[in-house]
Amino acid sequence: MAKVCVVTGKRPISGNNVSHANNRTRRRFYPNLHTHRFWVENENRFVKLKLSAKGLRIIDKKGIDTVLAKIRIRGEKV
C-alpha cells in the first residue's frame, strides 16, 4: 500500500537535503504513518488503517464510525 494516510490524505513530499556548504540533493519527506487496528462496535469486527499521527487524533475526536463513513463516501474500501 502507498505511504498515504487514509484519513487526512497526507503523502510524501519532496525537498532538499542541505549541507553545511549549501549543496542541495533531492530527498523525500514522509508522513508519520502507523498501522492501527480499531474495533468497530456496530460492525462487530476490527478495521486496520494506515494513519498519520494527526489522523489518529481526528479519530479520537470524532469517533471511528464517523471517520469510516467519510472514507466510504470517498469510495475507498475499508
Curated annotation (Swiss-Prot):
SUPFAM superfamilies: L28p-like. GO terms for molecular function: structural constituent of ribosome. One of its GO terms (cellular component) is cytosolic large ribosomal subunit. Pfam families: Ribosomal_L28. Keywords: Ribonucleoprotein, Ribosomal protein. InterPro entries: Ribosomal_bL28 (IPR026569), Ribosomal_bL28/bL31-like_sf (IPR034704), Ribosomal_bL28_bact-type (IPR001383), Ribosomal_bL28_sf (IPR037147). GO terms for biological process: translation. The keyword Glycoprotein does not apply. Belongs to the bacterial ribosomal protein bL28 family. NCBIfam families: L28 (TIGR00009). This is Large ribosomal subunit protein bL28. It comes from Ruthia magnifica subsp. Calyptogena magnifica.
